């Protein structure tokens, strides 16, 4: 059996885009930093997002059934740090300017690209929930380089 630490160390060697995944609802705005995001289908346009079930904001994503994947530009390392830290959700969102599209989920105004999504399916696998998300709107910026982990 592969040890969890060995798996995490090996996965850290894979280059991937850095994303801030956000949601909003009656209980407020929440978000987390994620690299486990990928395209599933172009028809219908669908993304896959993985989230640790132990995350304090996990329940809000489940209840809201919406999210936005905000792909960070190379100058937005501070947002990656903020959304992976222990600071409050309110403080996290003060670090940048946000807007909304179709779902009402927070969209980072100067992200490389943002995908506004409705969560259509949730699969539980090990420590994580896998959200299968239908994209309902896309916002692209003029940024040229993405932040890579």
Language-model segments: residues:
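Basic, polyanion-binding surface patches
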Residues: 1-149
